Amino acid sequence: MKAGSGDQGSPPCFLRFPRPVRVVSGAEAELKCVVLGEPPPTVVWEKGGQQLVASERLSFPEDGAEHGLLLSGALPTDAGVYVCRARNAAGEAYAAAAVTVLEPPAPEPEPESSECPLPTPGTGEGAPKFLTGPQSQWVLRGEEVVLTCQVGGLPEPKLYWEKDGMALDEVWDSSHFKLEPGRGASDEGASLTLRILAARLPDSGVYVCHARNAHGHAQAGALLQVHQPRESPPQDPDENPKPVLEPLKGAPKTFWVNEGKHAKFRCYVMGKPEPEIEWHLEGRPLLPDRRRLMYRDRDGGFVLKVLYCQAKDRGLYVCAARNSAGQTLSAVQLHVKEPRLRFTRPLQDVEGREHGIVVLECKVPNSRIPTAWFREDQRLLPCRKYEQIEEGAVRRLVIHKLKADDDGVYLCEMRGRVRTVANVTVKGPILKRLPRKLDVLEGENAVLLVETQEAGVQGCWSRDGEDLPDTCQSSCGHMHALVLPGVTREDAGEITFSLGNSRTTTLLRVKCVKHSPPGPPVMVEMFKGQKNKVLLTWKPPEPPPETSFIYRLERQEVGSDDWIQCFSIEKAGAVEVPGDCVPTEGDYHFRICTVSEHGRSPHVVFNGSAHLVPTARLVSGLEDVQVYDGEDAVFSLDLSAIIQGSWFLNGEQLQSNEPEGQVEPGALRYRIEQKGLQHRLILQAVKHRDSGALVGFSCPGVQDSAALTIQESSVHILSPQDKVSLTFTTSERVVLTCELSRVDFPATWYKDGQKVEESESLIVKTEGRKHRLILPEAQVRDSGEFECRTEGVSAFFGVTVQDPPVHIVNPQEHVFVHAITSECVRLTCEVDREDTTVHWYKDGQEVEESDIIVLENKGPHHRLVLPAARPSDGGEFQCVAGDERAYFTVTITDVFSWIVYPSSEVHVAAVRLERVVLTCELCRPWAEVRWTKDGEEVVESPALLLEKEDTIRRLVLPSVQLEDSGEYLCEIHDESASFTITVTEPPVRIIYPQDEVTLHAVSLECVVLTCELSREDAPVRWYKDGLEVEESEALVLQSDGPRRRLVLPAAQPEDGGEFVCDAGDDSAFFTVTVTAPPERIVHPAARSLDLQFGAPGHVELRCEVAPAGSQVRWYKDGLEVEVSDALQLGAEGPARTLTLPHAQPEDAGEYVCETRDEAVTFNVSLAELPVQFLAPEAAPNPLCVVPGEPVVLSCELSRASAQVFWSHNGSPVQQGEGLELRAEGPRRILCIQAADLAHTGVYTCQSGASPGAPSLSFNVQVAELPPVKLVSELTPLTVHEGDDATFQCEVSPPDAEVTWLRNGAVITAGPQLEMVQNGSSRTLIIRGCQLKDAGTVTARAGAADTSARLHVRETELLFLRRLQDVRAEEGQDVHLEVETGRVGAAGTVRWIRGGEPLPLDSRLTTAQDGHVHRLSIHGVLLTDQGTYGCESRHDRTLARLSVRPRQLRELRPLEDVTVHEGGSATFQLELSQEGVTGEWAQGGVRLHPGPKCHIQSEGRTHRLVLSGLGLADSGCVSFTADTLRCAARLTVREVPVTIVQGPQDLEVTEGDTATFECELSQTLADVIWEKDGQALSLSPRLRLQALGTRRLLLLRRCCSSDAGTYSCVVGTARSEPARLTVREREVSVLRELRSVSAREGDGATFECTVSETEITGRWELGGRALRPGGRVRIRQEGKKHILVLSELRTEDTGEVCFQAGPAQSLARLEVEALPLQMCRRPPREKTVLVNRRAVLEVTVSRPGGHVCWMREGVELCPGNKYETRRHGTTHSLVIHDVRPEDQGTYSCQAGQDSADTQLLVDGD
């Protein structure tokens, strides 16, 4: 039998989620989802957290894994979010969807045009319905297209067509569209035909026919595709085809894209008629395919998108647009950037048949590079569908069970997003599949196309598994179209086209159009004029929302964070909120927002808050209460609103600010409660003297009262008030207590209606008011109902006594059992008690004992035995013991084969002399087998052993030999197990060398590598540097017995390296180093040479080395040379050269050529050559110049450092005086800056001072200056004032000096005068001419001159900015301004009024600022009104000044005033005018002078004084005069309360009463008493009293903790602190404690009498403080203090101490222990399996007793092996990990009682 783990199944998983639904009120709403799971899940529907149940309108249809919710007659209340929750044993899943219920559409008038918005689709009988819809068509350009639709409906609907969402008259070129209205067949419905004459390519699109009437709207669409007809080939084959496109005039734009990325081209073309667009690549037209998408975006642009670009996509892309008016082109050059890391072998396009497989294969550069597969943008994970294989660097993707949707672009991507792309073509009935997904904006048209292989076939369109209506489907030949016009969110889903077994699917996603929410209301205001009401006003949002909207008003109580909705208002701009609208009294904030179908605006909060009080009504009033003496009396009433109220008792108001209070010391106590609308008054423990009391309740609008009646009762039960249910375990102590209202009153106990009788097992006790029934050791038979009965009243106790719970010790976990047919199966369950009865269940049914199932019970062990198991006996078994269960899963396997192992052929590889064991496992231990080798039965011998052990059969070869190789069979019946043994020799070992060998040799020396093996015939392989060597003349391999040699007869340096002798299982390593021969210089023979060369010249130093491959180094003067253009190194064969192409004298020196072993020296000297003139090569021609012209003489020498001498006519030339001598490298230059006649002559440049040195001569000739003359004359000019005047003339020569004169005076350049020289031209410019600039202008050059006259005309002074009419208020300053075209002199303009010059007035001022002239009138008067003008000699402008009387306004406004009650308030304001008469008002009522009202007016100041103010005078105070009204707030507050006399210091004795008193200034005021700065709260010892203006604090039974400082606080006033001192009371013990001896379980009483009554004592037992509760009761009767201890225990023994102040009394408590006995003993014998744990358990007579566990008489100590437990009276010993050595006798010692258990260990 073998154990395993079970399968937990799979949790629920949603294959299709429910989708949101929008329905009209009254229609059906249906939600559907598909959910799977193992086991099949249970599905429930919820809404608002509540599970839904089926009803008349609600049902839950199910169809396999599909679950639905069907809602009939949907109502607005049904709207909300519905949750589908699926559960099974493996988990839980849920999905949600929203249901929106719309109001039914209201009838609308018939629209006038197609621009009207469409109404919501109707569902009534008269709504439009398409009888015949338009059909999609595919036509060639120039053909005629006819689209027809026929619609029924009442009234007859109006029809109109749209193209791509636009009305036909909005289409750019619709002149060839023709509409033909008509009637349908049989005169049924209306029809409208759209005829398109000579269709053009731009006519392609979606055409939608709309039908509308008063009941609703319907629409149907069709797709029209117009194709370009194919061009016919030319008739003349020799004729070259015409180019498709015109050549580009300019260079195209360039676009780069990384390989594998997308490229997007967009062009925007305009024209009329609308152009036709074609895309071309390198002159070839492009058609859309998998990687080339062509479409038109929403902005009208034409887009070409190339997906996953490859190298073959590079080229020139052209967008060609043409219409009847012409054509235009736009081009871009696409470059595809290839990555550095590339696929070694990229993907190739593949084809496959539907339902077949295809394989994509590529190769990466490195096998360790990870890759990922994609189908377009979707990552593919390995699965049965997509098998991904990696073999080294090869990557394969195998696509199984091809479908039409598998057609597409596939990518393999490695790191760096490097991709290789391939197309997968799926051949099948569907040629062109649907796109993976389609995104459409809400309201747009959705078009889906499918092309099939065969024409005329009928396909099926569906959405989310539901067939779509025929009106939106069209087919034409091979093409099938689905047109969904005006899609909504409900149209979203999975669209499928099915054709036989083929199908293609797309995900239609509808994107919602974003609508902006409405704006918030504006100008919100709050008015609180009326009591308990508030008026809220606002204005509509700006701009107003386009759709209908409402206002939502919300409130928030001050101090709370929650806003609660008050009203929803449609059109009102104001609302009054009364107090009845709030639930509780308080201050409230308000806010408002605008709500429409597009959302909600931000909230706007009204400033301030309003105090509102709900109007309460009495819902349930007070009722008279009758109770018994000592009981609580409860008075309650319910109100209609949450409001505060006051309780009264006999006319005295009860304090409601404290939860508990007392009417007066020693009198009735009460508690006030308020929960929501309910108010309660609880009078606690009422006495007979309180009978007849009158209880009242009062709040605004409600007053009620009731009477209290106390009834006398002989006795009643204080506790328990209700029936008590108790549960105990056997042997546990049970105590039932009933407390009566009277002491020592008799009571009788009953059980199940029968009077009980006292015995040892049932004890009845009475102590004062308490009556007890005790069951010392309860048994199961003691269960029942107990009753304590007295004087007609009873207390009931339900007692249940149960056995202790049973625990399953073994197994602790789920057990899985595997067995075969006829095998015996045992299921064992061990419990912790022997007397426990267990029940066995199989697959939920209780099993019964039979021949095939045996049940065994032995002590705590319970077994279920299947003697001969069958497959049908398998299943889930449970062993149930009490509340615990043990689980077993049994699997019985039928035997189809005798041989269990091995199930396949076994191959065994062994070496000679090794031990080989062949094992075969059978399903039956008694089966006999037959062993054969190579077909012959084997014979057992010392060399071949046959073994048998249970079901195992073995063949053993102790020392296998080579001849033992072969096929061995273990045969039984018709079966056999095959073993193939292959015996080989033991591995070869290398004896020598054991370590790595290192050899050093010289070139041509013989090198021998030797290796000795452990076997002579063992083959070896030799390797050098990892490569196997090949024998040759230079490398010889030898074999001599066990020795193997590798010989290098004449080793070379390249023969060095690492050699390995590989003998298969062992290797030897040799490191050989061959040193090369010495490197020698063969030529020249001499080691030092002297060489001489001319400079500059070519120098080459040469030597030959041996061997030819030797490396050399060159040095110059001890430093290694560096290669450059001036020094070159060469090597050819044995020759080594150093070359100086252009040697200079400085290159002379010692040159050394050095090899590793030798060197040769070259002493190089360089002699300079004589200097030669290199340029010019011949004597230069004479140089002729004019005076002033620069002269440059230049020559080039053969040596840059050569010195030259210049001479002029034989005289040396010196630098300076206009001569400059320069040297630039080999060039020598003489420069004459400005030649004159003295510079004429021969200039000579001589190289060196020695006679006969080379020289070069230059002949320079300077011509005489020509005469200066004027070539052109000046021209007279006439200009306007402010313009520029330009005079120009020409002179010869061009550099002649010219002087300008005006009116005979020489002029110079300045801001107004500008002089310009340009060659021979001379110009004078006079800027901004003035009248004074007129005159004669002269230009003088040498002796010649020319003159011209300048005339300046005056410019008209015109107004550019004219006067504007002005309106002003009396007393303001007025400014009139004009702007002139030019800046005139002062006085050129004048101001007039009424046609006359301005009068002299100090209030009138004029000013000029450049072009601006300004008239200012200060403090304008009514008399200043009139027409004002400004005029010049050439222009005039007028304007009207209107003056209105001065407006009355406030200079200093009214201010809010706050005063205390009885005080006075002064309001004052200052106006802008004097002598104004106004009215004062308060709260809207006009005020008149009186004793409390004083009104004053002084000049512009107005004052109001109000005196003797009260709280009711708070409100608004206003002043009104003419059109002016201003207001302020008057706030009257209560006079603050003050403390007239504070509390005084007190000193009291402990236990006495302390009284503090303070006196206030007012009678009605609340006082807070504080102690040490902390507020005091009411308690039984603390009382507060109010006597007029006096406030008392009474502190009863003072103790030391009451000492401290006390003060009273009222408002902001605080009294001086008063100190309370508490003196300790002298206490003495009058009667000492007495010691007590008692037996365990009994009680003990201690009494102590002290000298003082009001004293608190403290009890201790054994040093521990005692507190009442449980087994301890403490009470005080006057001076006597009593301690009662019940149910004594041995640990209670100790010293009892009572202490009261300094007094103390001690006594001794002795508790005699009862003998400890065993109630339940452990079993005499217990059997435990090995490695399990054993539990021994014993129950003793009382808890707390000591139990000792021993083994073989030795006490056991707790630890890892042994664990002791105690639970009440039960003691356990747990032995962990039981071993055979743990077997023996275990003893338990409890007091004088003991018990033994024999522990037996079963198993190996």
From Swiss-Prot:
It is found in: Cytoplasm; Cytoplasm, Perinuclear region; Golgi apparatus. GO terms for cellular component: 3M complex; centrosome; cytoplasm; Golgi apparatus; perinuclear region of cytoplasm. Gene3D superfamilies: Immunoglobulins. Transmembrane segments: none annotated. InterPro entries: FN3_dom, FN3_sf, Ig-like_dom, Ig-like_dom_sf, Ig-like_fold, Ig_I-set, Ig_sub, Ig_sub2. Residues 227-249 are annotated as: Disordered. GO terms for biological process: microtubule cytoskeleton organization; regulation of mitotic nuclear division. The keyword RNA-binding does not apply. Residues 17-19, 85-94 are annotated as: Interaction with TTN. CDD domains: FN3 (cd00063), Ig (cd00096). This is Obscurin-like protein 1. The keyword Cytoplasm applies. The modification Phosphoserine is found at residue 10. Core component of the 3M complex, a complex required to regulate microtubule dynamics and genome integrity. It is unclear how the 3M complex regulates microtubules, it could act by controlling the level of a microtubule stabilizer. Acts as a regulator of the Cul7-RING(FBXW8) ubiquitin-protein ligase, playing a critical role in the ubiquitin ligase pathway that regulates Golgi morphogenesis and dendrite patterning in brain. Required to localize CUL7 to the Golgi apparatus in neurons. It comes from the Eukaryota. PROSITE patterns: FN3, IG_LIKE. Disulfide bonds join 33-84, 149-209, 267-319, 362-412, 738-788, 829-879, 920-970, 1011-1061, 1103-1153, 1195-1245, 1289-1430, 1558-1608. Residues 517-615 form the Fibronectin type-III domain. SUPFAM superfamilies: Fibronectin type III (SSF49265), Immunoglobulin (SSF48726). Residues 12-100, 128-225, 241-330, 339-425, 720-800, 804-891, 902-982, 986-1075, 1078-1165, 1176-1261, 1266-1442, 1536-1621, 1625-1694, 1702-1798 form the Ig-like domain. Keywords: Cytoplasm, Disulfide bond, Golgi apparatus, Immunoglobulin domain, Phosphoprotein, Repeat. It comes from Mus musculus. Component of the 3M complex, composed of core components CUL7, CCDC8 and OBSL1. Interacts with CCDC8. Interacts with CUL7; the interaction is direct. Interacts with FBXW8. Interacts (via N-terminal Ig-like domain) with TTN/titin (via C-terminal Ig-like domain); the interaction is direct.
